[in-house]
Design a protein with these regions (language model features):
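Active-site-proximal alpha-helix that buttresses catalytic centers in soluble enzyme cores
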Residues: 1-254
Length: 254
């Protein structure tokens, strides 16, 4: 039986950020060496930009269509998405449309799919980036209007339980937002902060919304509020601990 591993990411058009996706892909490919490896990106905008550069990456339906045409019978689809949400819902629907085209089509869970994974992520963040007295660790996620946004306040609790007394969870487009995080920093007397993307890659959001020089970036707004800021410009995909968590997700479906 011909088997394939299809790793599905939102994608990025930032060349350096793509390294973080590829690091996760390598771990996943090594975890299923008997399967032919292929990738797909779900963002139409990113796929268009990459195609214009001569670096095409298929969408999920196109990738599954190609696998079916090649006679593949067993496909393990592992997303690199961090949480359940609108993007995962669409991915799931797109995959379900091909269920009858394969003898077996299995879809993996996102990274932060349960409390155990949140605890592991929190422990990793505190261990790697926990700040000395007077400083703060601020994780910045994407955020969503989907109910799955509750992962972020849950992560705040997990950080504290992991020993991150001055570790804070914020989001670009969800809750907690900038105002909530700044209020906590002020209340706890934090004069310095390390901003770390809580995203697979340090792409557009990290470059602009987190660390950009414009007045609306988190870096600029924190500095305007009197908080000294350093930024880490690598995504979660660069961390071996996170790569291992993705590997565990894949083992659930192969």
């Amino acid at each position: 039986m011909k088997q394939a591993l299809l790793v599905v990411s939102f994608g990025t058009s930032v060349p350096r950020a793509r390294q973080d996706i590829e690091a996760v892909e390598r771990v996943l490919a090594a975890g299923a060496p008997e399967r032919a490896f292929c990738r797909a990106y779900t963002s139409p905008t990113i796929r268009r930009i990459l195609a214009e550069r001569g670096e095409p990456v298929p969408g999920l339906p196109e990738a599954l269509e190609a696998l079916a045409a090649a006679g593949v019978e067993d496909v393990a689809v592992q997303p690199t998405h961090l949480l359940y949400g609108f993007e995962y819902d669409k991915l799931k629907a797109d995959a379900a449309a091909f269920a009858g085209r394969f003898a077996r089509l299995a879809l993996g869970r996102p990274l932060a799919a349960d409390s155990e994974s949140l605890r592991a992520l929190a422990a990793c963040m505190v261990r790697r980036f926990g700040q000395p007295e007077g400083g703060a660790l601020v994780l910045l996620g994407h955020g969503t209007e989907h109910f799955a946004n509750m992962v972020y306040p849950a992560m705040q609790t997990a950080l504290r339980l992991a020993g991150g007394r001055r570790a804070y969870m914020g989001t670009v487009e969800g809750w907690p937002g900038f105002d909530e995080v700044l209020a906590q920093l002020k209340e706890d007397g934090c004069g310095q902060a390390l901003l770390v993307p809580f995203m697979l890659v340090a792409g557009d959001h990290a470059l602009n919304d987190m660390a950009g020089d414009g007045p609306k970036s988190w870096k600029s707004r924190l500095e305007a509020a009197g908080v000294g800021v350093r930024c880490r410009m690598r995504g979660l995909g660069a961390l071996p601990e996170v790569q291992a968590l993705y590997g565990a997700r894949l083992r659930e479906i192969v």
